[in-house]
Regions:
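Short, intrinsically disordered, charge-biased short linear motifs at domain edges
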Residues: 13-18, 39-40, 119-122
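Predominantly extracellular/secreted and cell-surface proteins with exposed
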Residues: 81-135
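Amphipathic/hydrophobic helical signal segments and adjacent flexible N-terminal regions
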Residues: 24-85, 131, 141-145, 153-192
Length: 192
C-alpha cells in the first residue's frame, strides 16, 4: 500500500497533539507576598544574649492569622493567648523561648517544646524543616516546608514560611507550587 501525505500526517499529528496537551496540562504556580521585597535585611540575628519580641506580628501576610507564623509563640508549640512577648535565646544548637504576659510575668509552657534546633544558612536561621515524597494512585509527589528567621536593619524579626510541592500526574504531567508568607515581629524591651 502506497502512503499518502495524509496518512503520514496521522502519527505526526497525534504526537503533536499529545505534546500540546502535556504542555498545556503541566504547570507551576508561585505565591509570594510582594511586601517581602520591601524588607531591608540586616545582619544575622544574634540571640546569644537573648532578644525579646512582640508575640503578635506588626505585619502578617494576608490569610495567615491562624497559621504557624500568626504568633511567634506558635513556632515553639505554645498557643496561649495571654502571651504578649517572647524572648529567644541561643543555647548551643537550640533556640530557647521564654514567654511573658503583658505585666512581664513569665508564662510556663507546659507540654510544649519551648526550644527548637536550627541550622544557619547564610544570614538566616532555619527551623521546622520537613519534607515528604510518596507515590500515589494518580502519580508521585513531594511536599516540603521550612521556617526561616532573619533580622531587619531595624533589628526586628522576620519569620518566613516557605512551602512547596511537586507532582508528576500519571507519571507524565509535571506540576509544581511554591508559597512564601511572612510575619514581622517588633523587637521590644522586656516588660518589667
Amino acid at each position: 500500500m502506497k502512503q499518502t501525505a495524509s496518512s503520514l500526517a496521522g502519527p505526526g499529528l497525534a504526537c503533536l497533539t499529545l505534546l500540546t496537551v502535556l504542555a498545556l496540562g503541566s504547570g507551576c504556580s508561585s505565591v509570594r507576598d510582594a511586601r517581602l521585597a520591601e524588607i531591608r535585611p540586616g545582619p544575622r540575628c544574634d540571640f546569644t544574649e537573648g532578644a525579646t519580641f512582640d508575640n503578635r506580628p506588626s505585619y502578617l501576610s494576608a490569610g495567615q492569622e491562624n497559621a504557624l507564623i500568626g504568633a511567634l509563640s506558635r513556632l515553639f508549640g505554645v498557643y496561649n493567648k495571654d502571651i504578649h512577648q517572647v524572648t529567644i535565646r541561643q543555647e548551643a544548637s537550640r533556640l530557647v523561648a521564654r514567654f511573658h504576659a503583658a505585666d512581664g510575668t513569665g508564662i510556663e509552657a507546659a507540654g510544649s517544646a519551648s526550644s527548637k534546633s536550627y541550622s544557619a544558612e547564610g544570614e538566616q536561621l532555619v527551623i521546622n524543616r520537613w519534607s515528604s515524597c510518596k507515590p500515589g494512585e494518580a502519580g508521585a509527589g513531594c511536599v516540603w516546608s521550612r521556617v526561616e528567621l532573619s533580622c531587619t536593619v531595624e533589628n526586628d524579626l522576620v519569620v518566613k514560611q516557605v512551602d512547596g510541592g511537586a507532582v508528576l500526574l500519571a507519571l507524565i504531567i509535571p506540576m509544581g507550587q511554591r508559597r512564601t508568607q511572612f510575619g514581622v515581629y517588633r523587637r521590644v524591651d522586656p516588660a518589667e
